[in-house]
Amino acid sequence: IQMTDFKQKLRGFFSDSSLFRRIYIIDLFFTNIAFLQIPAYVLLVFLFIWGVCLSVYNQRHNNTFFKLRFGIWIGAFLAVTVFTMLINFSQTFLYSLLMLLHVVMCFFLFYGMHTEPEFDYRIELYHIAKFIMYATTVMNIIGITCLMFGFKFEWYWIKFTVYENRFTGCYDNPNLLGFISVVSIFCCHILSKGHFMRRIAEKIPEPGISKIWIVACLATNAFSLILCDSNASL
């Protein structure tokens, strides 16, 4: 009986599209952190395999493709992509096939999440926004503190705190820092909206987010955004 329960829990874990989306986005975030880039990309390989299998599972159980909004245009896009790959067959065919599978996965699991029964985007948005707020605040505090004490170094691809007189902090390059800072500020805006948080409180029995964290996130990300001098963030 215990083995059966374990298999059911394992099946429930790997068939949870919502959980997959949260883990996938969080892992994509870690690919931008210089010190965590390699393990994050390694994990991304396993997440890709999980995502492709989950897309097949959702199609079999939820009939995802035929419930997609504008599904006929998505199908046409994928068909043209396959046709183009075949008529331009080359040494990069395997790479193109992997990219095609990734596109299919994104269509089914991200764009197609509206086809899932009892789906509520607010819960996922809340968890992802909260993670980004906490993670970027901690990363920015580390980076800004090291910058203030003049601690910086270069090692292979890592340009810690400063790269070409631009602030990088813990990230891979200043442009990524700028982009993530903008996303973090937007996440703070979401988490500070009263009606959104009230809807979340109705479904998740956990304490709200401290305003200290929101203010710290806004302040450190605004400061980092200025120091990174990133045109891409505009």
Identify the role of each PLM range.
Residues 41-51, 96-110, 175-191, 232-234:
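Hydrophobic core segments of transmembrane alpha-helices in multi-pass, intramembrane catalytic enzymes
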Residues 1-59, 79-88:
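N-terminal signal-anchor transmembrane segment
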Residues 82-92, 149-152:
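Juxtamembrane "helix-exit" motif on the non-cytosolic side of transmembrane helices
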Residues 70-79, 91-115, 127, 131:
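Aromatic-anchored transmembrane helix interface
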Residues 56-68, 115-128, 196-208:
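Membrane-interface helix-boundary motifs at transmembrane edges
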Residues 162-174:
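Short aromatic-rich membrane-water interface segments that cap or initiate transmembrane helices
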Residues 126-156, 172-234:
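Alpha-helical transmembrane segments of multi-pass inner-membrane proteins
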